[in-house]
């Protein structure tokens, strides 16, 4: 799984490389444009384009029929029934491209969350490091500590939560850069990246997880912990990022879907795609 995550992640690093020092909106606009083109290509080559065109024309004709015969209840009712029938047919034509798109879109969304979902820490800012243990381990029985780092300082002793199989520390960022947070468990060391005051568009991994298909799928930003590790995950509580639109703070997912749909509908005529 890591080989796929690493390779897939490199594609997004290449895409966003020119936008690292720019406002995140530029990177969002570009990836939304690419997504819109991808959706159009899928529709063009996997759907019944002729059938979609015919169905849309039928729906338009029956809508016009309702307007022309609005005083004739029977004809209007029949036209509405036909509109419903052709809408269902249109949905059936759209099902195949939607099925083709769903998995790639999920994989894209997971990667985009690394780029648009979190703020890096700022010097002086505090965050919580959460270490989750596997269920067979007790946090009271293990010796855990965080090694010193030039980029941050450990601001609290470990808080061991036996019921949650969890150990927490508070850290404070000191110096900008990407640093390795090294957690020692007995005689073993485990590393997690910490991002401090990075570029406006930066890949930030909130969690490093143990080898597990679903966990690795959802948190693909770092190589997973070894399967024999007592740790289930290492997490840093970065603050969530919003897209600023004239003072309105929007979740990146909303912006991404809206822009992708706008680009898709805006380019469908130019590319001669029926959707």
Feature names for model-found ranges:
Residues 1-39:
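Long, highly hydrophobic alpha-helical transmembrane signal-anchor segments
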Residues 44-54, 258-275:
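Juxtamembrane interface at the cytosolic side of transmembrane helices
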Residues 45-94:
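Membrane-interface amphipathic helices and adjacent TM-edge segments
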Residues 48-57, 112-133:
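Alpha-helical transmembrane signal-anchor/signal-peptide segments
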Residues 89-118:
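Transmembrane alpha-helices and immediately adjacent membrane-cytoplasm interface residues
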Residues 165-167, 174-181:
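Short tyrosine-centred short linear motifs in exposed loops/low-complexity segments
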Residues 182-238:
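Extended, hydrophilic extramembrane loops/domains of integral membrane proteins
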